[in-house]
Amino acid sequence: MKKLIVTADDYGYTKAINEGIIRAVTEGIVTDIALMVLTDPEDLEHGLKLLKDHNLNEVGLHTSLFHWGKTERPGRGDFIKFFKEASDNEIEKRALSEIAEFERLVGAKPKFISPQFNMHGNLRLLKIMAKYVVANNIPMRIPRALIEIEEITDSNYSAEIYLKRLGVKMTNHLYAHILGADTEAIKQSFLHELGSVQDDESVEIILHPGYNDQITLESSSLNYERARDLSLALDPIFSKNIQDLGYTFSHMSSLWSQK
């Protein structure tokens, strides 16, 4: 049986995104939530309350390193500049501080680690995160090439091999279609990709479901795409198509039972 994990990124960013993701989990195919903890306190607390109210525990850390809020949002250039100029100690301090904040807020270690902007493609950061996940038996998202483009199609074989040698658990495949207005075309692309997976392999699909309010429209680079992904997550035909391909919906935390 093939495993499919469907992760909703950007939880905690705005209330509208929080509410859309909760619906995508409780009524749709989303299995795991990637939580940002360096967001505006009001939006973060709103998200944490919803997790508690709905008894949702499959929550991982969506590493961002910088504060993301209504009036402050880093761009790719900020990350490139940071990794170019920061010392190893500065990167480690910022990364471990963010992990500690997740543990403090959630009251548990993250069920998985995933990055904003593919930043785990930076090998200095990757080594820090790998040390943490190995020590705590936590899966990671497959690393991709670093933050140069919106899509995450570029493989990062050196980073993958490094993690595999350490014994870090990852899915066998990672699929995402971040941009695009044609919902049906994206659905068919996902199904085509899923159809190529071998039995007993695992896949993570990344979605960005959410509602749009004024704050989200003004502060996020993804707007229509969030409504599109919420529609995909709630589509019963899409869910059935996936199951007809031999998939069972699972969680990142289940990867520790995967050989």
Task: Please identify what each model-predicted range represents.
Residues 8-11:
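DG-centered beta-turn motif at the end of beta-strands
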Residues 117-122:
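Gly/Ser/Thr-rich loops at beta-strand to alpha-helix junctions
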Residues 1-5, 15-57, 63-106, 112, ...:
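Terminal accessory/targeting
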